[in-house]
């Protein structure tokens, strides 16, 4: 399948998908920073722009749809999908924002969810029999997270936490089964990621054992 997504090292910001001035975006960002300083619940830039009547709800939905498709297309697992397929699969994903030092995947817990890291930084880790943490890897955008639980009935095989404020896309495994099992390029890429992550985990655990 032809990939029509323009490859960039970093995903594009939402403002690049909206037909509004940079000044309007700066005002929205200022309001977001003010809310943070006051300890109030922070809204997304798009929501603030709608409240300011700079854009319409429909404009925001369309921009998010296009941004989501681009971000998913930058993920190694889904980069072979066409533009139409990326927009389609994007309907199953939603945006998640997390603060720094926030553990959101817990080893041994049932969480049938695939995440895509689109901004920020994550740490993957496990624990030995004594409860000591074993660092496995740091993960940077754009990479899938939580994929190894797919073949474990949703049980996570490692823990993951944010290192800095992080943006993710998330979707339930059940929404992605068709792509993982019936789209060859996606299935191959998905298995490649799993094999690489398994090798990293085994290597880190061996290194930790050798240090004792």
Listing of model-derived features with the role each one plays in the protein:
Residues 68-69, 82-88, 156, 174-212:
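A small-molecule sensor/coupling module
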Residues 122-134:
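A short beta-strand-loop-beta hairpin characteristic of the jelly-roll/cupin
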């Amino acid at each position: 399948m032809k990939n029509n997504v323009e490859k960039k090292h970093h995903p594009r910001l939402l403002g690049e998908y909206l037909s509004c001035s940079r000044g309007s975006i700066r005002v929205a960002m200022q309001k977001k920073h003010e809310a943070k300083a006051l300890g109030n619940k922070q809204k997304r830039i798009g929501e603030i722009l709608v409240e300011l009547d700079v854009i319409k709800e429909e404009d925001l939905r369309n921009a998010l749809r296009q941004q989501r498709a681009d971000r998913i297309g930058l993920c190694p697992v889904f980069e072979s999908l066409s533009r139409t397929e990326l927009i389609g699969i994007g309907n199953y994903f939603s945006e998640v924002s997390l603060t720094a030092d926030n553990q959101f995947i817990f080893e041994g817990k049932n969480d049938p969810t695939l995440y895509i890291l689109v901004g920020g930084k994550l740490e993957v880790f496990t624990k030995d029999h004594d409860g000591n943490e074993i660092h496995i890897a740091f993960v940077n955008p754009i990479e899938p997270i939580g994929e190894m639980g797919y073949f474990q009935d949703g049980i996570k095989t490692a823990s993951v936490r944010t290192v800095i404020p992080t943006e993710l896309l998330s979707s339930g495994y059940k929404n992605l089964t068709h792509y993982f099992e019936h789209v060859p390029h996606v299935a191959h890429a998905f298995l490649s990621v799993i094999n690489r992550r398994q090798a990293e985990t085994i290597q880190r655990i061996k290194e930790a054992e050798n240090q004792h």
